[in-house]
């Protein structure tokens, strides 16, 4: 059996991103999202999450802003404090543990601080993106070299190719859907609407059925692990 988690990053980063993620869940194939707890639309995201209990909710640790370091990654103690604070804030806001851990701009993969994320994930028995049996696929993204937009990598055809290439076991495909809003203009912006169109395209759903892929979230994955 092929199991696929489709996780939308940046929940809480803006109202437009929040609405896009919910649309990708309701109308498309997104099964999971990662909440940022220190961004302008965090409270709105938490409220939305309560209305969609089947949408898995993880923690998207944000140690960076849009291109800015919020914490000096060379200061391990500062990173540890911020990591703990964001984890505790997630629990306070949602009343539950996150289903999984990942991070904005993949800072948890940086050598100097990665072990701090690993320790936190082990303490609570939570999957950490790229450090579990779940195969992580980051290729569905519309900017690569020097911030250049590559729309072909967020097309319906490319998404279908990623789904067809998913091996037996569990794969996570990361995505960043959203709606463009005037008050929020990040580096990665209009590409989010292109992603949203692909994630909600009927052809994509048809391929999932044809390939025998079962869409799950990290909570489903943890339940499977407990049974095994």
Predicted regions and their residues:
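C-terminal domain-boundary segment and adjacent tail
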Residues: 186-228
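Catalytic domains of cell-wall/extracellular-matrix polysaccharide-remodeling enzymes
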Residues: 87-164
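A short alpha/beta connector and helix-capping loop motif
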Residues: 16-40
